[in-house]
Amino acid sequence: MENAIRNAFTMKVKSGFETEYKIRHDQIWPELTALLSESGICDYSIFLDEETGILFGVQKLSSGFDRSQLSSHPLMRKWWNHMSDIMETNPDNSPKTNSLKEVFHLD
């Protein structure tokens, strides 16, 4: 994806649910991965700090990516509901995230 915007953020999995988090992502719904791709997200990875439960997400976003459109999609909300019992979430069940500032990049 040319002119992709790199995006990094943290989330948190609840203590004791690290394995379940991995299982659910190993079984991610194909229609959700399609939605993410169609929305302009590619090259998406999530890493886990096993000591703290902090999840580090990194993704590339197309220049036309619209987070509000994805956030309001019923399938995205269904996924958030599915994950809400094992993650720190906002009142709407979206994961609590902390955006990270890029301080170095090497291609």
Swiss-Prot record:
EC category name: isomerase
Sequence ranges of Polar residues compositional bias: 90-100
Enzyme Commission number, as recorded: 5.1.3.32
UniProt KW keywords: Carbohydrate metabolism, Cytoplasm, Isomerase, Rhamnose metabolism
Residues involved in substrate binding: Y21, Y44, W79, W80
One cellular component term from this protein's GO annotations in UniProt: cytoplasm
Keyword field contains Isomerase: yes
Pfam families on file: rhaM (PF05336)
Residues annotated as the enzyme's active site: H25 (proton donor)
GO terms, molecular function: L-rhamnose mutarotase activity
A GO biological process held by the record: rhamnose catabolic process
InterPro entries assigned to the protein according to its UniProt record, in alphabetical order: Dimeric_a/b-barrel, L-rhamnose_mutarotase, Rham/fucose_mutarotase
Domain of life: Bacteria
Cellular location(s): Cytoplasm
Region (Disordered): 88-107
Reactions the enzyme catalyzes: alpha-L-rhamnose = beta-L-rhamnose
Similarity remark: Belongs to the rhamnose mutarotase family.
Quaternary assembly: Homodimer.
Function: Involved in the anomeric conversion of L-rhamnose.
The protein's name: L-rhamnose mutarotase
Organism from which the protein derives: Flavobacterium johnsoniae (strain ATCC 17061 / DSM 2064 / JCM 8514 / BCRC 14874 / CCUG 350202 / NBRC 14942 / NCIMB 11054 / UW101) (Cytophaga johnsonae)
Gene name per UniProt: rhaM
